[in-house]
């Protein structure tokens, strides 16, 4: 029989470590993780690498033997280093082995494709890092005496991270802009909208409006009810440049860490809440908002997250203000606002929490689609409709085509996009709370729009931001349930909650690795022709009507009349006084469907009596319309293409 002290110590260990897990379950779990890691190693490093079948088997057996050896070694070292008994060390290592579930998230890429070895190594490193984190969390749960107080607070660390994050992402953003790495047309479009607004024309841009609409359209409000553009006006007034829009957008993105921290802090410790905020900023759909072409929709996350926070805190008036701010970003936020009303109904809240958001969303939808858009469209067909026209001309016809031809949606790109959207959340972690359902309309719209050639099913475009907010919210709001589950099992809730948050952090980093390719690095490279491109843009008079290559558009967007030289012949009123021709088609970053029109423009200019060459080099030719001459360029019907 043990002494009283020994009995108390044993009881303390059991209280710290949670209830005893039957040995059979531990064995099954470890065996499952072992088989998973073995399969992943085979798929990532052995299969499809040119090895013969016998050699593949030898390498696989060697890898499995190495895993067994490392497992035994880790168990021995842990037991001796931290003076743990067999039960404690086993419990810690079983818990820590869960980190390798991260490999399962990206196993399909390895089984169905052949990812770069660098990506596989980075994923392996991420899994090992997560294993170390889990080990630390579990060890401190077993031995609370090992806990220590960091010299700085979690809030200060998060603030420092956000400062570094903002300057790093903004440096990349500006480097990409100066390296002509952006396609450029969307950035130039919104820059011109702000310029024309300051000169008496509300959010007007002939660069798109004269191209996409057969009838006169004089405002961006014909396509989107995004009154948030007014937010950019004072900043643009201070510095009239495309870079201003990009920097302001990045500020709004990094500020999202604030409401995420507040939401997480409701159920987590300060340090775990800070990790959750960092994880959100590193999710690919959020991180790439800082780098991709500009869109006002990137501002939607901040008010949505604050709306979620005030919803959870039951602060009704601030909640309504946040909803209003979110709705001002774009008309399709009505799905999110209405969804939050339904979430309140699910939670059986009072009538005002349900009725007011739902009624507001319906009224805003009616105002946008029945009043605002018809007024500014002036009878023209909405450009947005081209994204879905392939499905049919009426809602009923579209629905029938979707039901009878599911292959229209179940394309490789759409399936890959859906997977990339959920990778950062382990594919399933968001399912623990119904908040994720609010993301469904947005994912569906993106998948449907992709079939119409609108490039909406891309995880790093602005379209993916709103669904990501609600997928992440599904994880955050489930943490309270995770804690309750742990308590019912007699375990420390902080341990399981930490496991979820840390898993999302490493899954977000790993997902970013898998969606980042060589193109993202090439966009930052300085090329030999960049200096001349800057000189060419500077040669164009500030008040002249100009047509330039798309990548050059942001540099010359501060003017009343702006055209894409790539599609100049497709404009309804092509009246450019200066036309810049890039002689290298590869720099145009365009598909072959535009090549014929561009070649036709070059031939017309070479034989034109109205346009004269004022600059010519191996890279560029600048044509100037003679004084008093009319452009008289022929018009060709524009291809159906969406701008955003």
Can you name each region flagged by the protein language model?
Residues 1-34, 68-169, 353-356:
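Start-transfer (signal-anchor) and selected internal transmembrane alpha helices
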Residues 69-80, 243-267, 306:
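Transmembrane-helix motifs of polytopic, lipid-linked glycan transferases
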Residues 89-102, 156-163, 271, 358-362, ...:
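Signature aromatic-anchored transmembrane alpha helix within multi-pass, membrane-resident enzymes
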Residues 117-128, 257, 437-488:
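Hydrophobic/aromatic-rich transmembrane helices and adjacent perimembrane loops
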Residues 146-148, 336-363:
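Perimembrane helix-loop-helix junctions
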Residues 172, 350-441, 468, 476, ...:
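Membrane-lumen/periplasm interface segments of specific transmembrane helices
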Residues 254-285, 301-302, 317-321:
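Transmembrane-helix signature of polytopic, membrane-embedded enzymes
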Residues 296-299, 304-319, 345-348:
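Membrane-interface transmembrane helices that cradle and orient dolichyl/undecaprenyl
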């Amino acid at each position: 029989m043990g002494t009283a002290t020994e009995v108390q110590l044993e009881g303390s260990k059991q209280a710290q470590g949670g209830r005893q897990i039957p040995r059979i379950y531990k064995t099954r779990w470890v065996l499952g993780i072992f088989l998973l890691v073995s399969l992943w190693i085979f798929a990532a490093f052995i299969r499809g690498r040119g090895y013969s079948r016998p050699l593949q088997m030898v390498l696989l057996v060697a890898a499995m033997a190495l895993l067994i050896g490392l497992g035994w070694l880790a168990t021995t070292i842990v037991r001796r280093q931290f003076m743990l008994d067999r039960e404690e060390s086993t419990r810690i290592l079983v818990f820590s082995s869960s980190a390798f579930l991260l490999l399962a998230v990206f196993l399909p890429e390895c089984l169905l494709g052949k990812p770069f070895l660098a990506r596989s190594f980075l994923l392996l490193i991420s899994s090992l890092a997560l294993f170390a984190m889990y080990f630390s969390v579990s060890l401190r749960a077993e031995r609370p005496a090992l806990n220590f107080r960091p010299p700085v607070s979690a809030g200060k660390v998060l603030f420092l991270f956000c400062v570094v994050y903002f300057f790093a992402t903004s440096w990349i953003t500006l480097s990409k802009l100066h390296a002509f790495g952006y396609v450029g047309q969307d950035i130039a479009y919104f820059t011109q909208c702000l310029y024309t607004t300051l000169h008496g024309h509300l959010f007007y841009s002939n660069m798109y409006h004269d191209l996409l609409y057969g009838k006169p359209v004089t405002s961006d409000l014909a396509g989107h009810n995004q009154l948030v553009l007014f937010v950019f006006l004072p900043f643009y007034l201070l510095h009239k440049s495309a870079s201003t829009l990009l920097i302001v957008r990045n500020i709004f993105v990094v500020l999202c860490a604030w409401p995420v921290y507040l939401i997480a802090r409701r159920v987590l410790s300060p340090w775990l809440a800070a990790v959750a905020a960092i994880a959100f900023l590193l999710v690919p759909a959020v991180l790439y908002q800082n780098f991709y072409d500009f869109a006002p929709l990137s501002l939607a996350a901040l008010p949505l997250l604050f709306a979620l926070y005030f919803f959870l805190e039951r602060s009704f008036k601030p909640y309504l203000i946040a909803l209003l701010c979110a709705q001002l970003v774009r008309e399709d936020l009505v799905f999110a606002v209405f969804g939050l009303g339904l979430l309140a109904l699910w939670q059986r809240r009072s009538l005002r929490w349900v009725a007011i958001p739902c009624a507001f969303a319906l009224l805003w939808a009616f105002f946008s689609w029945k009043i605002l858009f018809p007024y500014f469209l002036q009878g023209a067909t909405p450009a947005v409709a081209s994204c879905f026209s392939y499905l049919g001309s009426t809602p009923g016809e579209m629905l029938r085509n979707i039901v009878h031809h599911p292959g229209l949606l179940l394309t490789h790109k759409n399936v890959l996009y859906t997977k990339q959207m959920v990778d950062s959340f382990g594919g399933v972690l968001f399912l623990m709370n119904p908040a994720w359902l609010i993301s469904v309309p947005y994912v569906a719209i993106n998948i449907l729009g992709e079939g119409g050639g609108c490039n909406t099913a891309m995880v790093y475009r602005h379209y993916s931001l709103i669904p990501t907010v609600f997928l992440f919210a599904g994880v955050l709001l489930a943490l309270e349930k995770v804690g309750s589950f742990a308590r019912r099992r007699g375990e420390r809730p902080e341990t399981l909650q930490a496991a979820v948050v840390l898993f999302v952090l490493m899954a977000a980093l790993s997902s970013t690795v898998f969606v980042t390719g060589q193109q993202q690095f090439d966009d930052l490279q300085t090329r030999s022709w960049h200096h001349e491109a800057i000189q060419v843009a500077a040669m164009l008079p500030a008040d002249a009507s100009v047509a330039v290559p798309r990548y050059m558009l942001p540099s010359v967007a501060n003017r009343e009349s702006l055209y894409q030289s790539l599609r100049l012949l497709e404009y309804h009123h092509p009246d450019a006084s200066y036309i810049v021709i890039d002689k290298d088609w590869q720099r145009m970053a365009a598909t072959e469907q535009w090549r014929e029109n561009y070649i036709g423009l070059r031939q017309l200019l070479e034989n034109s009596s109205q346009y004269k060459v004022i600059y010519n080099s191996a890279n560029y030719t600048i044509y100037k319309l003679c004084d008093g001459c009319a452009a008289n360029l022929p018009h060709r019907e524009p291809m159906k293409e969406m701008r955003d």
